[in-house]
């Protein structure tokens, strides 16, 4: 399972970094609509967090990214035996590391996927593949914890009860 997680994480990270490289050198000054005004490809450099929040505070965002990656490692260790949780967390890690890489080496995050839903300012944003990994991984992890974690916990308790009953009978 560990090898699978490493492979998944590396492949996803490579896809993210290649897509950012291609966007940076091929899309400057362009806006390519894909689905009307709702979805398109455009290149932007975001020196903040989501929606440009904390723009210009690269050092703070790097520190926050380091803390998030450490927390992610702790969560991964804690849930390492929960079925599929390590895969979901590998997806999150690929997203976190992709954006962390950008902040370290460029001072900003390279975004290229424009999403617009109506005229609402909170739904008009540009993101990247790493951001999508973050959302997918977090949602998958939440589903796994909600639906599989209790089963694993119960089976672990059953195994412990069985071993304790064997100790009593021996």
Task: Briefly describe each language-model feature range.
Residues 1-170:
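Alpha-helical transmembrane bundles and membrane-interface segments of multipass inner-membrane proteins
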């Amino acid at each position: 399972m560990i090898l699978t997680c490493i492979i998944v994480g590396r492949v996803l990270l490579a896809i993210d970094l290649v897509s950012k490289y291609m966007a940076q050198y091929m899309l400057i000054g362009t806006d390519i609509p894909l689905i009307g005004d709702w979805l398109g490809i455009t290149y932007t450099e975001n020196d903040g967090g989501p929606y440009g929040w904390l723009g210009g505070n690269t050092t703070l965002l790097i520190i926050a990214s380091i803390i998030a990656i450490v927390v992610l490692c702790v969560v991964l260790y804690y849930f390492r035996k929960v079925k599929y949780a390590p895969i979901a967390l590998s997806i999150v890690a690929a997203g976190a590391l992709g954006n962390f890489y950008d902040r370290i080496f460029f001072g900003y995050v390279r975004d290229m996927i424009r999403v617009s839903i109506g005229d609402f300012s909170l739904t008009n944003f540009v993101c990247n593949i790493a951001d999508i990994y973050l959302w997918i991984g977090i949602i998958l992890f939440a589903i796994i914890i909600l639906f599989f974690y209790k089963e694993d916990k119960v089976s672990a308790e059953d195994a412990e009860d069985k071993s304790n009953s064997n100790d009593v009978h021996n």
